[in-house]
Amino acid sequence: MRDINEFYKATLDEDFESAVGICAHDRIAHVWPEIIHDCIDRFDDAWRLDQISLVEVSGAFWTTRRVLDHMLAQGVPVTGSMRDAGRIMLCVPRTDEHSFGAQLLAEQLRRSGYHVVLFINRPNAEIFHHLHSTHFDVFGLSIGYDQSLLGLADVIAEARITSKNPAIAVELGGSSFEGAPSAYSFLNADLLLTNGQN
């Protein structure tokens, strides 16, 4: 908890060096993605409760993004189990402008032993090509904007057809999905995360 509090304060102060130092500390180097994720939730809650200003939350997110980019560029060694838990293709559609959450998720999955390929704003043709040429266990889509839902069922159907793995699992998540998963049954996904629930 102390590490989260310190990281939260450092990012609100836009203190990049301190924030990186907290994440890179040997004692918590294996859990830094969770610290960033928890702080993002705190920023969101504080903003909704009018506890921080727009300037503060914008600066905090900007600093957090810099920290994430720095940690990923450093290639911090994976700790814990090094087993091959499976291959995942995680995609952010071209109609989406977000990628922050997807980058965090990809890093957390890698640390859990998964081989993750992350595609951000890439053409569908390129995605289908990789699905066809490489065996993946999971095809995941992170959807943050409602316009990305348009034609999504067709993308999923095409992904299943072209996939080298005929039993590939299709998993969806992101802020566009709210309410009961049954409302999105027309997408024919194997797993749908709505507000952290499946």
What would you call each of these model-derived segments?
Residues 1-79:
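Long amphipathic alpha-helical segments
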Residues 80-88:
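A short, charged/proline- and glycine-enriched loop
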Residues 119, 123-183:
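Cofactor-cradling patches in redox/metallo enzymes
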Residues 96-100:
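Conserved small-residue-rich beta-alpha loop and adjacent elements
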Residues 103-116:
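Short helix-loop-beta junction
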Residues 115, 135-137, 187-190:
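Glycine-enriched alpha-helix->loop->beta-strand junction motifs that scaffold or abut catalytic
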Residues 175-198:
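Peripheral docking tails and interdomain loops at the edges
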Residues 87-95:
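Short hydrophobic beta-strand segments
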